UniProtKB/Swiss-Prot annotation:
Homodimer or homotetramer. PROSITE patterns: PEROXIDASE_1, PEROXIDASE_2, PEROXIDASE_4. It is an enzyme of class 1 (oxidoreductase). It holds the Pfam family peroxidase. The active site is at H92. This is Catalase-peroxidase. Its cofactor is heme b. It comes from Pseudomonas savastanoi pv. phaseolicola (strain 1448A / Race 6).
Length: 756
């Protein structure tokens, strides 16, 4: 008998066919249980903000400056300076952010983990992170990878002569890949067929003639710009594994005008307007080069597929030396300016100073070179001082010249370099800080003093706060005002549940529920909301006017307090006397401090906690519920207890009775779970789409309850049913109320970073 046949172990723990393999559409609750203490080596007592505040910030910056020009033989610096590589590293860390769901961005250092560490657009960034490992190693816990990556990009810009707008730390690392982010459904790198569906494919490359020449481009339409090309939400990249657009053009077609359409769509989904987009491209491409020294088949597997001996690196290149002048990254071989490690306006000067014709890189990728051999010898070689080149451009670069709106901005920046410098500094700061949330999270000596609208500013509290006696008195007035428990609870939920743990936006602080656009969202029942707010504002005015010591209560605080009063009253109705924890300190933002367009992305397309869905979607209602719970940073038990409690408190949008499995509404009982688990009823679908159901008494056939998919999933899904059985047990009443209050308080305080 052979040695192999004696061994009974063919697979390690966790291998084999999984539940997901058997049931691909099974509801995924794992996204609610990420980033726990079980995966965090720092321990639960670790306080990153405290550690960062003790950092010798200037010493870190000096160490990074030293790294910039200390070229390493194992990965030589282009032009003797790593600055452009580090700018790309920071850009690609932050540039995954998208407004639709707040996911992506630099805030958690996810570039270290799959899939981002192995995206085709991130080739060679594995080396960039290794180059700064000595700095990370030196300062250890005092600076996270997430902060260091962004800071390195800032220092790189400064070391190349650019004045940045500022830098703020405060991005604690996570220690595992984020499984909750939807990056697309394609199963091949650079695939785009799923995100564009069955839409018309781009035409094949033309003969290298620009779609629109300078003298008449405003009147000539791209052969593809008019075609239907709608990117799937919430994605903000045109192909799987790219940050934004294909630099060769849509689907590799070198059409600058069509490329502009993709650029506008993807950068817009990253919260950038046209001016910010032009500034980022023109500013970023003032530096460095792209790499396409040879055919892509010389490049080995990405980090996640590479062998153990590669130690987390990937894309080993067998072309020539595999590095330096033989580097293959994107397959494009473009250097934009003659001073690629020094800030200048030459990118725009070259863009408009030459006429361009299509050519190919040594790797066979579409790129552009000046016509008639113009510009020859203007550009230095990255590694061989004896060689010179002509400037070159990407299809996506030419979009800034041949798209009418981009061209107007680009020419203004060309003629006013100081405007480009200011716009790039501000856009770079926004790019690298967009997912950090409120200013309370910003740390460090270089945090800008200027208040920026995209930061969702909230005024500082400049008055004394209410004390326990005031809180009790205010709750009494609220409960005596005639407002019902559902009105109080639903209003507080509407305010707080806008929070997104992804980009730390939303929440009750700021009192923006009373402002556009939130006051007009259908999910918030505008007519009812207006009446509730009018009553609460009256209570606020009366209280504030009666104070002689400067004590005040904000409407933001009062909305949350009113919800707490409603929960306490509902618990009292069930025979439980509880006090919902309340911490004052919220402030009221103004309409002028609120970007209506930006806040529109926080409007929920579905809120299962209020049994609301705006439309019909491919994604199941229960999956949308889990997605909402994940954005609220809830665990599966917290999601369950909140939904079960909110159902019996009767806060459904439109006063729908779906899921209100109780004869005692406005009473905080565990009736939702008890009646859902009742075997005396039989559930049947009442719609062809299987999205509404009714429960009929097995003996009489009478309809007893109605519900939606988000209600029935708590009895259908095995894991959720197990949780429901805990809360539906006869001895669970007290635990249910206690857990509901804890989960409610968590949601009310999700945006209170000032309490951390």
């Amino acid at each position: 008998m052979s040695t192999e046949s004696k061994c009974p172990f063919n697979h390690a723990a966790g291998g084999g066919t999984t539940n997901r393999d058997w049931w691909p559409k099974q509801l995924n609750l794992k996204i609610l249980h990420q980033h726990s203490s079980l995966s965090d080596p720092m321990g639960e007592s670790f306080d990153y903000a405290k550690e960062f505040k003790s950092l010798d910030f200037e010493a870190v910056k000096q160490d990074l400056r030293d790294v910039m020009t200390r070229s390493q033989d194992w990965w030589p610096a282009d032009f003797g300076h790593y600055g452009p590589l580090f700018v790309r590293m920071a850009w690609h860390s932050a540039g995954t952010y998208r407004t639709g769901d707040g996911h992506g961005g630099a805030g958690a250092g996810q570039q270290r983990f799959a899939p981002l560490n192995s995206w085709p657009d991130n080739v060679s960034l594995d080396k960039a992170r290794r180059l700064i490992w000595p700095v990370k190693q030196k300062y250890g816990r005092k600076i996270s990878w997430a902060d260091l990556i962004v800071l390195t990009g800032n220092v790189a810009l400064e070391s190349m002569g650019f004045k940045t707008f500022g830098f703020s730390g405060g991005r604690p690392d996570v220690w595992e890949p984020e499984e909750d982010v939807y990056w697309g459904s394609e199963t091949t790198w650079l695939g785009g067929e799923e995100r564009y569906g069955a839409q018309k494919k781009m035409q094949q490359p033309g003969d290298g003639t620009l779609v629109a020449e300078p003298e008449n481009h405003a009147n000539e339409e791209s052969r593809t710009a008019s075609g239907e090309r709608n990117l799937e939400n919430p994605l903000a990249a045109v192909q799987m594994g790219l940050i934004y657009v294909n630099p060769e053009g849509p689907e590799g077609v070198p059409d600058p005008v069509a490329s502009a359409k993709d650029i506008r769509e993807t950068f817009g989904r990253m919260a950038m307007n046209d001016e910010e987009t032009v500034a980022l491209i023109a500013g970023g491409h003032a530096f460095g080069k792209t790499h396409g020294a040879g055919p892509a088949d010389n490049v080995g597997p990405e980090p996640e597929a590479a062998g153990l001996e590669e130690q987390g690196l990937g894309w080993r290149n067998k072309f020539g030396s595999g590095k330096g002048g033989d580097t293959i990254t994107s397959g494009l071989e473009v250097t934009w300016t003659s001073t690629p490690t020094k800030w200048s306006n030459e990118y725009l000067e070259n863009l408009f100073g030459f006429e361009w014709e299509l050519t190919k890189s040594p790797a066979g990728a579409h790129q552009w070179t000046p016509k008639n051999g113009a510009g020859a010898g203007k550009i230095p070689d990255a590694h061989d001082p004896s060689k010179r080149h002509a400037p070159s451009m990407l299809t996506s670069d030419l979009a800034l010249r041949f798209d009418p709106a981009y061209e107007q901005i680009s020419r203004r920046f060309l003629n006013n370099p100081e405007q480009l410098a200011d716009a790039f500094a501000r856009a770079w700061f926004k790019l690298t800080h967009r997912d950090m949330g409120p200013l309370a999270r910003y740390l460090g000596p270089e945090t800008p003093a200027e208040e920026l609208l995209w930061q969702d500013p909230i005024p500082n509290v400049d008055h004394a706060l209410v004390d326990d006696q005031d809180v009790a008195a205010l709750k009494g007035k609220i409960l005596a005002s005639g407002l019902s428990v559902p009105q109080l609870v639903s209003t507080a939920w509407a305010a707080a549940s806008t929070f997104r743990g992804s980009d730390k936006r939303g929440g009750a602080n700021g009192g923006r529920l009373r402002l556009a656009p939130q006051k007009d969202w259908a999910v918030n029942q505008p007519a009812q909301l207006a009446g509730v707010l009018k009553t609460l504002e009256g209570i606020q005015s009366e209280f504030n006017a009666a104070q002689s010591s400067g004590k005040q209560v904000s409407i933001a605080d009062l909305i949350v307090l009113a919800g707490s009063a409603g929960v306490e009253q509902a618990a009292k109705n069930a025979g439980h006397h509880v006090t919902v924890p309340f911490t004052p300190g919220r402030a009221d933002a103004s309409q002028e401090q609120t970007d209506v367009e930006s806040f529109s992305f926080l409007e929920p397309i579905a809120d299962g906690f209020r049994n609301y869905q705006k439309g019909h979607y491919k994604v199941s209602a229960e999956s949308l519920l889990v997605d909402k719970a994940q954005l609220l940073t809830l665990t599966a038990p917290e999601m369950a207890v909140l939904l079960g409690g909110l159902r019996v408190l009767n806060i459904n949008v439109g006063q729908s009775k779906h899921g209100v499995f109780t004869d005692k509404p406005e009473t905080l009982s565990n009736d939702f779970f008890k009646n859902l688990l009742d075997m005396g009823v039989e559930w049947r679908a009442t719609s062809g789409a299987n999205d509404t159901f009714e429960a009929r008494d097995r003996k009489t056939g009478a309809v007893k309850w109605t519900g939606t998919r988000v209600d029935l999933v708590f009895g259908s899904h095995a894991q959720l049913r197990a949780i429901s059985e805990v809360y539906g047990s006869s001895d669970a009443n007290e635990k249910f109320v206690k857990d509901f209050v804890a989960a409610w308080t968590k949601v009310m305080n999700l945006d209170r970073f000032d309490l951390a």
